[in-house]
Regions:
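Acidic two-metal-ion nuclease catalytic site recognized across multiple nuclease folds
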Residues: 167-231
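Alpha-helix initiation and N-capping motif
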Residues: 74, 132-135, 209-212
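Acidic, Mg2+-coordinating catalytic module of metal-dependent nucleases/exonucleases
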Residues: 85-91, 97, 134-191
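Conserved non-catalytic scaffold segment of RNase H-like nuclease domains
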Residues: 1-115, 125, 137-151
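Long, acidic, intrinsically disordered low-complexity segments
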Residues: 93-120, 207-231
Protein backbone atom coordinates (compact mmCIF):
# COMPACT_ATOMS: atom_id res chain seq x y z
CA UNK A 1 0.00 0.00 0.00
CA UNK A 2 1.16 3.52 -0.82
CA UNK A 3 1.04 6.28 1.80
CA UNK A 4 1.93 9.94 1.50
CA UNK A 5 2.96 11.64 4.74
CA UNK A 6 1.90 15.28 4.37
CA UNK A 7 2.26 18.53 6.27
CA UNK A 8 1.63 22.19 5.48
CA UNK A 9 2.53 25.58 6.92
CA UNK A 10 0.15 28.51 6.52
CA UNK A 11 -0.39 32.21 7.12
CA UNK A 12 -2.90 31.49 9.89
CA UNK A 13 -5.72 29.25 11.05
CA UNK A 14 -8.67 30.18 8.83
CA UNK A 15 -8.65 29.14 5.15
CA UNK A 16 -12.17 30.50 4.68
CA UNK A 17 -11.03 33.94 5.87
CA UNK A 18 -8.14 34.39 3.45
CA UNK A 19 -5.31 32.45 5.10
CA UNK A 20 -3.16 30.53 2.61
CA UNK A 21 -0.65 27.70 2.39
CA UNK A 22 3.00 28.82 2.30
CA UNK A 23 4.76 25.44 2.45
CA UNK A 24 3.92 21.82 1.73
CA UNK A 25 6.05 18.75 2.39
CA UNK A 26 5.24 15.18 1.33
CA UNK A 27 7.08 11.88 1.79
CA UNK A 28 6.17 8.66 -0.01
CA UNK A 29 5.98 5.28 1.72
CA UNK A 30 5.44 2.06 -0.21
CA UNK A 31 4.49 -0.95 1.90
CA UNK A 32 5.62 0.99 4.99
CA UNK A 33 9.06 1.75 3.57
CA UNK A 34 10.30 5.21 2.50
CA UNK A 35 10.89 5.22 -1.25
CA UNK A 36 13.10 8.31 -1.19
CA UNK A 37 10.53 10.29 -3.18
CA UNK A 38 9.52 13.61 -1.67
CA UNK A 39 7.64 16.71 -2.73
CA UNK A 40 8.43 20.09 -1.21
CA UNK A 41 7.37 23.59 -2.15
CA UNK A 42 7.50 27.01 -0.57
CA UNK A 43 4.69 29.17 -1.94
CA UNK A 44 3.95 32.86 -2.27
CA UNK A 45 0.62 33.26 -0.44
CA UNK A 46 -0.27 36.40 -2.42
CA UNK A 47 -0.91 38.23 0.85
CA UNK A 48 0.99 39.47 3.90
CA UNK A 49 2.49 37.15 6.50
CA UNK A 50 1.23 37.83 10.04
CA UNK A 51 4.03 37.97 12.58
CA UNK A 52 2.26 35.41 14.79
CA UNK A 53 2.41 32.85 11.97
CA UNK A 54 6.00 33.73 11.04
CA UNK A 55 7.04 33.12 14.64
CA UNK A 56 5.87 29.51 14.31
CA UNK A 57 7.54 28.54 11.03
CA UNK A 58 10.02 31.35 10.36
CA UNK A 59 8.70 32.07 6.85
CA UNK A 60 8.35 35.76 6.06
CA UNK A 61 7.08 37.74 3.10
CA UNK A 62 10.54 38.68 1.77
CA UNK A 63 11.57 35.00 1.60
CA UNK A 64 8.31 33.92 -0.07
CA UNK A 65 8.11 36.82 -2.55
CA UNK A 66 9.80 34.96 -5.43
CA UNK A 67 8.28 31.54 -4.70
CA UNK A 68 5.61 29.99 -6.94
CA UNK A 69 1.94 30.55 -6.16
CA UNK A 70 -0.24 27.55 -5.33
CA UNK A 71 -1.87 27.53 -8.77
CA UNK A 72 1.47 26.83 -10.44
CA UNK A 73 2.25 23.75 -8.32
CA UNK A 74 -1.27 22.38 -7.77
CA UNK A 75 -0.99 19.82 -10.58
CA UNK A 76 2.30 18.43 -9.22
CA UNK A 77 0.76 18.04 -5.78
CA UNK A 78 -2.30 16.22 -7.16
CA UNK A 79 -0.10 13.89 -9.24
CA UNK A 80 2.13 13.07 -6.27
CA UNK A 81 -0.72 12.11 -3.92
CA UNK A 82 -2.86 10.35 -6.53
CA UNK A 83 -4.11 6.90 -5.40
CA UNK A 84 -2.29 7.15 -2.05
CA UNK A 85 -3.66 7.15 1.47
CA UNK A 86 -2.56 10.45 2.98
CA UNK A 87 -1.23 10.55 6.56
CA UNK A 88 -1.63 13.87 8.40
CA UNK A 89 -1.36 14.94 12.04
CA UNK A 90 -4.56 16.87 12.81
CA UNK A 91 -5.94 16.24 9.33
CA UNK A 92 -8.91 18.68 9.36
CA UNK A 93 -6.48 21.61 9.53
CA UNK A 94 -4.37 20.70 6.48
CA UNK A 95 -7.31 19.30 4.51
CA UNK A 96 -9.30 22.49 5.09
CA UNK A 97 -6.51 24.53 3.53
CA UNK A 98 -5.89 22.13 0.65
CA UNK A 99 -9.58 21.91 -0.20
CA UNK A 100 -9.85 25.70 -0.18
CA UNK A 101 -6.78 26.15 -2.39
CA UNK A 102 -8.18 23.79 -5.03
CA UNK A 103 -11.61 25.39 -4.71
CA UNK A 104 -10.05 28.76 -5.56
CA UNK A 105 -8.83 27.17 -8.80
CA UNK A 106 -12.28 25.83 -9.64
CA UNK A 107 -11.11 22.24 -9.13
CA UNK A 108 -12.57 19.39 -7.05
CA UNK A 109 -11.55 19.33 -3.38
CA UNK A 110 -8.26 17.72 -2.46
CA UNK A 111 -10.11 15.04 -0.51
CA UNK A 112 -11.71 13.78 -3.73
CA UNK A 113 -8.27 13.06 -5.20
CA UNK A 114 -7.28 10.46 -2.62
CA UNK A 115 -8.81 7.16 -1.46
CA UNK A 116 -8.41 7.82 2.25
CA UNK A 117 -6.84 9.77 5.11
CA UNK A 118 -5.12 8.61 8.30
CA UNK A 119 -5.22 11.21 11.07
CA UNK A 120 -2.40 10.33 13.46
CA UNK A 121 -3.72 12.78 16.06
CA UNK A 122 -7.01 10.86 16.35
CA UNK A 123 -5.16 7.55 16.46
CA UNK A 124 -2.77 8.87 19.13
CA UNK A 125 -5.68 10.10 21.24
CA UNK A 126 -7.15 6.60 21.12
CA UNK A 127 -3.84 4.95 21.94
CA UNK A 128 -2.85 7.45 24.67
CA UNK A 129 -6.07 8.89 26.13
CA UNK A 130 -5.60 11.80 28.50
CA UNK A 131 -2.04 12.50 27.33
CA UNK A 132 -0.60 15.29 25.19
CA UNK A 133 -0.34 14.05 21.62
CA UNK A 134 1.41 16.81 19.72
CA UNK A 135 4.03 15.73 17.19
CA UNK A 136 6.82 16.58 19.65
CA UNK A 137 5.09 14.56 22.38
CA UNK A 138 4.80 11.51 20.14
CA UNK A 139 8.43 11.80 19.05
CA UNK A 140 9.48 11.77 22.69
CA UNK A 141 7.12 8.88 23.51
CA UNK A 142 8.47 6.71 20.69
CA UNK A 143 12.12 7.70 21.13
CA UNK A 144 12.35 9.62 17.84
CA UNK A 145 15.00 12.35 17.80
CA UNK A 146 13.54 15.79 17.14
CA UNK A 147 16.06 18.06 18.86
CA UNK A 148 16.82 19.64 15.46
CA UNK A 149 13.22 20.88 15.21
CA UNK A 150 13.48 24.49 16.35
CA UNK A 151 10.62 25.81 14.18
CA UNK A 152 7.77 24.15 12.34
CA UNK A 153 8.67 23.13 8.78
CA UNK A 154 6.47 21.13 6.41
CA UNK A 155 9.11 18.72 5.09
CA UNK A 156 10.86 18.30 8.45
CA UNK A 157 7.55 17.68 10.19
CA UNK A 158 6.54 15.18 7.49
CA UNK A 159 9.81 13.30 8.08
CA UNK A 160 9.14 13.14 11.82
CA UNK A 161 5.52 12.17 11.24
CA UNK A 162 6.62 9.32 8.97
CA UNK A 163 8.68 7.90 11.84
CA UNK A 164 5.79 8.40 14.27
CA UNK A 165 3.29 6.77 11.90
CA UNK A 166 5.52 3.72 11.44
CA UNK A 167 6.04 3.45 15.19
CA UNK A 168 2.32 3.75 15.90
CA UNK A 169 1.35 1.12 13.35
CA UNK A 170 4.21 -1.33 13.84
CA UNK A 171 2.99 -4.89 13.36
CA UNK A 172 0.12 -4.06 11.02
CA UNK A 173 1.58 -6.12 8.21
CA UNK A 174 1.58 -9.23 10.38
CA UNK A 175 -2.04 -8.59 11.30
CA UNK A 176 -3.10 -7.96 7.72
CA UNK A 177 -4.44 -4.49 8.51
CA UNK A 178 -4.20 -1.36 6.45
CA UNK A 179 -5.39 1.27 8.91
CA UNK A 180 -4.38 2.17 12.46
CA UNK A 181 -8.08 2.35 13.36
CA UNK A 182 -8.41 -1.37 12.59
CA UNK A 183 -5.44 -2.20 14.79
CA UNK A 184 -6.91 -0.20 17.65
CA UNK A 185 -10.33 -1.80 17.20
CA UNK A 186 -8.82 -5.26 17.36
CA UNK A 187 -7.07 -4.35 20.61
CA UNK A 188 -10.19 -2.86 22.18
CA UNK A 189 -12.31 -5.89 21.27
CA UNK A 190 -10.18 -8.32 23.27
CA UNK A 191 -12.26 -10.24 25.79
CA UNK A 192 -11.73 -9.40 29.45
CA UNK A 193 -10.49 -12.13 31.75
CA UNK A 194 -12.11 -12.16 35.20
CA UNK A 195 -9.67 -13.28 37.89
CA UNK A 196 -10.72 -14.41 41.35
CA UNK A 197 -10.50 -11.68 43.98
CA UNK A 198 -9.19 -13.90 46.79
CA UNK A 199 -5.75 -14.60 45.32
CA UNK A 200 -3.04 -15.18 47.92
CA UNK A 201 -0.33 -12.49 47.96
CA UNK A 202 3.19 -13.91 48.29
CA UNK A 203 5.78 -11.54 49.77
CA UNK A 204 9.48 -11.79 48.97
CA UNK A 205 11.67 -13.05 51.81
CA UNK A 206 14.99 -11.45 52.89
CA UNK A 207 17.07 -13.73 50.66
CA UNK A 208 14.97 -12.97 47.57
CA UNK A 209 15.11 -9.23 48.27
CA UNK A 210 18.92 -9.42 48.59
CA UNK A 211 19.24 -11.34 45.30
CA UNK A 212 16.96 -8.83 43.58
CA UNK A 213 19.10 -5.92 44.79
CA UNK A 214 22.23 -7.68 43.50
CA UNK A 215 20.57 -8.10 40.09
CA UNK A 216 19.70 -4.39 39.95
CA UNK A 217 23.29 -3.47 40.81
CA UNK A 218 24.56 -5.73 38.02
CA UNK A 219 22.15 -4.14 35.52
CA UNK A 220 23.27 -0.66 36.59
CA UNK A 221 26.94 -1.65 36.27
CA UNK A 222 26.55 -3.02 32.74
CA UNK A 223 24.34 -0.20 31.46
CA UNK A 224 26.34 2.50 33.31
CA UNK A 225 23.11 3.98 34.66
CA UNK A 226 20.38 2.98 37.12
CA UNK A 227 17.48 0.95 35.72
CA UNK A 228 14.94 3.32 34.12
CA UNK A 229 12.15 2.30 36.50
CA UNK A 230 14.23 3.56 39.45
CA UNK A 231 14.93 7.00 37.92
Amino acid sequence: MRHIILDTETTGLHPNQGDRIVEIGCIELENRRPTGKTLHFYMNPERDMPEAAAAIHGLRSDFLADKPIFASVAQEISAFVKDAHVVIHNAPFDLGFLNMEYQRLGQPPFTQMIPGVVDTLIDAQRMFPGKRNRLDDLCQRFGIRNDHRKLHGALLDAELLADVFLAMTRGQNDLGMDHPQELLSSQMNLQKSHLPTDLKVLMANDTEIHLHEQLLQEIAKKSKQPPSWLQ
